[in-house]
């Protein structure tokens, strides 16, 4: 008797998402954690299942549950109260104020990125993405068969955008430049003057600016956060955000996309209609969280963010100071935001390390330490180190990193100064 697997079935799995999935951060992260020994020393960073958020946010969700205000389906574009609350919150410092109609609630910032890519994707179109940058922009672009062109940064100028590289990449099929501010993984925050220059360049090139601002609440450097929407009088701007990083609730899956459109360009070019159509056929963020958004945004005390930012600043100072004892890694600037250190890998310092992926694979196997390779962020032979952990745990992680580098080193390189210069 023939088994079912012997039958020549007329169906098979689609490979439509294969290439995109290979570029996702989740694929890199899962592969590295799988190399760690669950019976060895504690795996770092720990894969936390419990995150502590603001008590105000927790109360807001409980209130929505008890009142039943989050039990029903939400409109495809988002709950009116949530959209209004986001608009009011983001309007601080904006000369051109947002309305609820300019806000689209999304299933986290990832769906906001998907929305930004999908509503603009056309045959032969290309998009400018940062290198390095958050992989989800690349993942979605690959999935939509968009041509991706990577622009560069100037590490010696605190990772400002290299406008010459932007100008050289644009042609008649380029529709947008994506930026991340504060930047993941560089950790820098753009000045108002730099963002204005970007807006003027984008206007000249006739492309829009899409700004991922999800890390705006993790700022701890001297530069203030400046929203890209402030320059919508110069160029059409799309901003992306969510409560995941600021409130430490990535599992709540609630974000937004906003259209900053002074002269109705998005309406005239049918971008507004495309955004509405996209959300009509896609999943919505949890209604119960949307119902809690007004209280979360309005009532969370500043002390919550101050405490979080102080914690991150302390860890950056600690981690940055320790890196000077690892000559094979160069951190060009002390981060001003986010939860990472971004370092360049000097392959000439090692006897048996081929590239950043090989470094991270061996590090995971030998030290139970997960550091992400730069190739995951479209920049080969760099590394992203998480610093979002308590000081004793971070110290352990950095000691393991140094031990690994010393063990594989082919020489004793000179000590670097605190600025990462050899």
Curated annotation (Swiss-Prot):
Domain of life of the organism encoding this protein: Eukaryota
Keywords: Lyase, Pyridoxal phosphate
Gene3D superfamilies in the record: Aspartate Aminotransferase, domain 1, Type I PLP-dependent aspartate aminotransferase-like (Major domain)
GO BP terms, alphabetized: amino acid metabolic process; biosynthetic process; hyperosmotic salinity response; response to abscisic acid; response to jasmonic acid; response to microbial phytotoxin; response to wounding
Tissues in which the UniProt entry reports expression: Expressed in cotyledons, sepals, pistils, flower buds, phloem companion cells and vascular tissues of petiole, leaf, filament and fruit.
Cofactor(s) named in the record: pyridoxal 5'-phosphate
GO MF annotation terms: L-cystine L-cysteine-lyase (deaminating); pyridoxal phosphate binding; transaminase activity
UniProt keyword Chaperone present: no
Record field: catalytic activity: L-cystine + H2O = S-sulfanyl-L-cysteine + pyruvate + NH4(+)
Assigned EC number: 4.4.1.35
Family listed: Belongs to the class-I pyridoxal-phosphate-dependent aminotransferase family.
Assembly and interaction partners: Homodimer.
Described purpose of this protein according to its UniProt entry: Possesses cystine lyase activity in vitro. Does not possess tyrosine aminotransferase, alanine aminotransferase, aspartate aminotransferase and tryptophan aminotransferase activities.
Additional note from the record: Induction by wounding requires COI1.
This protein's name: Cystine lyase CORI3
Organism from which the protein derives: Arabidopsis thaliana
Taxonomic path: Eukaryota, Viridiplantae, Streptophyta, Embryophyta, Tracheophyta
